[in-house]
Design a protein with these regions (language model features):
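Glycine- and acidic-residue-biased ligand/ion/polar-headgroup-sensing regions
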Residues: 70-88
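Histidine-centered metal-chelating micro-motifs
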Residues: 63-65, 83, 100-110
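Bacterial N-terminal signal peptides
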Residues: 6-16
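Short acidic-glycine-tyrosine-enriched beta hairpin
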Residues: 58, 88-105
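A short, N-terminal "cap"/entry segment at the start of jelly-roll beta-barrel domains
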Residues: 4, 18-52, 85, 95, ...
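A short beta-loop-beta micro-motif enriched in histidine and acidic residues
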Residues: 47-49, 61-74
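Ligand-binding loop in jelly-roll beta-barrel domains
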Residues: 104-130
């Protein structure tokens, strides 16, 4: 069962709130490098699914390995930049204030930009499934 419209509206509202400019000089939390899980729990409007939200603080030019998720991913860029590649599509550069939805099962990868990446990502995860599934790099064949 896929999450319904109420789940998507709630996620969109949450991401929209992140885009509201704040006062100058407001201190911003700086988590340790990596992905810090900040929220996780069941979604009442989508039985059989739970939401995981992460605060991403990725160092400059760090690779984002090939992977996919069993549920949808919603990524909102707060600072820095990232290059995302979805299998079968070209590179996409995302900058502060931009967001992307990645469909379930879509193999994707990328790298943080030259100044690193700060972002918030939310994943709608079917119960009993892992958050992320690693996908081995495709070997380059001679002549390609």
């Amino acid at each position: 069962m896929r999450p319904g419209l109420p789940v998507l509206i709630a996620l969109a509202a949450g991401l929209g709130a992140c885009a509201t400019p704040g006062p100058e000089g407001v201190a911003v939390y700086q988590p340790a490098p990596g992905i810090s899980e900040v929220l996780s729990g069941p979604i009442q409007a989508a039985p059989g699914h739970h939401l995981v939200t992460g605060d991403l603080n990725i160092p400059a030019n760090a690779p984002i390995p090939r992977h996919y998720h069993h549920g949808e991913e919603f990524l909102y860029i707060l600072g820095g930049s990232t290059v995302i590649v979805r299998e079968g599509q070209g590179e996409m550069t995302l900058r502060p204030g931009q967001a992307i939805r990645i469909a379930p099962g879509t193999v994707h990868w990328g790298r943080a930009g030259p100044k690193g990446l700060r972002a918030v990502s939310s994943w709608v995860v079917p119960d009993g499934q892992p958050l992320r599934v690693a996908v081995p790099e495709q070997p380059v064949r001679p002549g390609e």
